[in-house]
């Protein structure tokens, strides 16, 4: 289960609509807790993928990931997951998403159109990396 506030969910949705028709991306910051992950902050990142691929791929560079991890540590937080958008596509992980994900983390995907965010779901990867499972979202 992932626990997240309305404010953070709205930030993800707004980022997705703002970056449409390209995929947006960012980090989910908070804590790993006994009851699951608790998100207290989002950390938006610019999609570093080349222009021709941004419509269906995102890239977080190692430098940006380190910046985000440093930002989290300075606030006594952890990276508990990632988010990205699927412009004009369902909010379900692609095969590419599966191949590039890491177990343990949450992956929030929001489906966007030019003027609105649609479905938003969270996913967790199996430890053997074979597939994603839907993750319950608790909104606070």
Regions from the language model: what does each represent?
Residues 82:
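Conserved, mostly hydrophobic/aromatic
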Residues 1-79, 87-140:
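Conserved beta-strand-loop surface patch within small alpha/beta domains used
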């Amino acid at each position: 289960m992932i626990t997240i506030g309305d404010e953070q969910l709205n930030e993800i949705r707004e980022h997705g609509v703002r970056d449409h028709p390209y995929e947006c991306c960012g980090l989910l910051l908070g804590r790993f807790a006994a009851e699951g992950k608790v998100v207290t902050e989002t950390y938006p990142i610019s999609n570093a993928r080349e222009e021709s691929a941004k419509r269906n791929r995102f890239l977080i560079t190692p430098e940006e990931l380190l910046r985000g991890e440093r930002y989290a540590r300075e606030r006594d937080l952890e990276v508990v997951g990632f988010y990205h958008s699927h412009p004009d596509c369902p909010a379900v992980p692609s095969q590419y998403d599966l191949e590039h994900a890491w177990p343990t983390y949450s992956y929030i995907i929001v489906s966007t159109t030019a003027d609105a965010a649609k479905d938003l779901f969270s996913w967790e990867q199996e430890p053997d990396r074979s597939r994603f499972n839907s993750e319950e979202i608790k909104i606070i």
